[in-house]
Amino acid sequence: TNTPARFLFPMFTATDLDELMVETMGRYRWEICRRIQGVYWNDIRERSLTSEYCDYIQFYRKNSDLSADAKEKVKTALARARNSYREVFVKDYISWMKYESAGSFRLNKVAREILVRYCPFAKDVRVNLMQNPQYQNVFRKLNAENAKKVQRLTAMYDKYEAAGGEITPELNENLKYYQM
């Protein structure tokens, strides 16, 4: 039961294969987070992609970080997605991967912060985007959070190894993820 995920795409399709892959990855991220979180997928006390995104969508009207125009766009996106939070996330994820990665702003501040935290770009993309003042604060915050996690994990791993434990490849991969 511990096998890698597999994605099947049609050989012949009317849509662009790259867009189809990005859309599928957005759905996958949402569903895997729901599966991992279990019944807490929507509970903001358990911080996760789905819980923070649901909180953002549910309470966008009261969110002071959103302008009136941004609130209207969220309302329209929610109506277009037939009140499906997953579909709103997938559309934002597509914009994140397609446009925001190239430096073109399509998302509001709140959605961007959630996606930076849970769906970060590769280091070279982040370095290019750091030139832009819109991204500097969120990437600085991400780098600080990651540095804190690296420090905590390194201390934990050192303590574990000192007690005679062995660090598995999965734990090393986890550490590398935060070092990126």
Model-derived features with residue positions:
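Active-site-flanking segments in enzyme catalytic domains
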Residues: 1-179
